[in-house]
């Protein structure tokens, strides 16, 4: 009690230290209860689908996060007394991949889930919090469209477990494999690939058209790249979109990526997901990290995606255990205010 009183006095005398660091927050009382209810609801649905929880450490070798999407550039780093470069947890998937590759090697398939916070550096101007609350699942050792469909179905079930009805849930599905094949066929440099990714991600059709006209040689690859800035299509409209994309495929790699996406969509449709599926070939984030299926989750009332994931078949190999994997994470900061868990 005396220590608490002393700390309170120190806080009053030093108001700069009284607030949590920029981009973080205290969760008190009802906010804490709501978060725990949501986490419990998600844990139930994950375990009902055969997933087991793993709890990675909150601090890792910085090298682990160098394998994450973005290369770990936004990880908060520190050097310990032995001179080791460490980082606060910036990405759960990289940690789960490390666990699967080093602790659970040879066990397939693995169905693992997690919940907790990640910490990433961000500027005050961006409005993006440094600390973000997440929960998610990873399926390791399964490569087929059935595994992709399983994760899409579990993502939809997760939203439903939080009280988000099917009519208020939407999953935008694409494949980074098609975009990778297009930029390879176009001979795009890293600089051009980044510029194309940015224009496609913003759905900037005029800007993308101008960029392609100036820097991409005429041909199927250029026409297909421009098409990627089009709005998402409903699943009912997807066949026409995929057919057009196939016609513009500059080679077998692009065609194969589209076929894998079509197979995953067919398998997902057979599962009656309980969420509206949209096909968005402009889902091109995570180039160099994701290898096939990519998707974002949306909920009515949220201004941005509330989760996302995809297939990352090369990540475990970077830890010495090459196995395919697919997974997703949920943004609990965005979902908890919307949730009505049962």
Where are the predicted features?
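Short, well-structured alpha-helical patches and their helix-loop capping segments
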Residues: 88, 107-110, 129-131, 140-151, ...
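Short acidic (Asp/Glu) and glycine-rich catalytic loops that position anionic groups and cofactors
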Residues: 20-22, 72-75, 204, 220, ...
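Acidic, His- and aromatic-enriched active-site or binding-groove loops in soluble protein domains
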Residues: 74-82, 187-212, 273
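Beta-rich nucleic-acid/ligand-interaction surfaces
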Residues: 56-73, 170-184, 283-291
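TRNA-binding/sensing appendages of the translation machinery
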Residues: 1-94, 149
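Positively charged, Gly/Ser-enriched RNA/tRNA-binding surfaces
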Residues: 2, 31-32, 37-49, 60-61, ...
